[in-house]
Amino acid sequence: YDLDVFGPHSLFQYINRTCTQLGKSLLANWLGTHLENKKEIESRQEAIRELALELNFRQEFRILGLLYKGKAADEDELKAWAKSPSVFRKNIFFRMLPLLAGGINILCIALAIAGIIPLTVFGILWLCFVFASFCFTSKITKMQAVYGKKLQILATYANLLRLIENQPMKSPILKEVREWIGDEKQTASHSIQRLSKLMNELDQRNNAYIYATLNGLFFWEIRKIIQIEGWKEQYASELPRWLTAIAHMDALC
């Protein structure tokens, strides 16, 4: 009897072992628009035969992929987020503010040590900077929440990318997948780890003592959000390739 491609008890249901929404969507696309070129078919078969022998790799890939319960909109949301304009980094006032505040504080401390001005002047300026930082708290908190959600997705993907980076590849398709995620000097997983580090540093603003001290010295949270926006600008063009690499590896596994 005929076997349906999609739906209950379908071909897709029987062969689908993907662990990400990216891989599931790609596998469905492959079944819906099958290859007709002989060389392309043989090339994909070669990649599948190679992965069939790598049981540990496939099992670890699946386990890591299932740690995050993704949704169908993840890919579009990540790409839209990567293309979204920077709020603080594009504004010269915000870029200069941490430098100006830091410079003024250093100057005041130096003058106070030299006995030219009383130390209370530094204390008053520091308090002014702390209160001024409250003007940006709401906007930065909203951005922190958005970036945190994206990082949750990217952190899972970083583990999958690291597996791909460390796995020896022989077939042309698998080698191409490796090329999509960077070279030894700058890997995709390392780049995402850098974002994770920046986000962890920004999370220190939840500590009231650190928040007041560092913002009073050089508007620390603005400096951090500018660095995070810089990361997004630097890797926005790379993100679609990373997602494509994960999707292909997941569908092939």
Regions found by a protein language model. Name each.
Residues 1-253:
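Alpha-helical bundle segments enriched in helix-capping/polar residues
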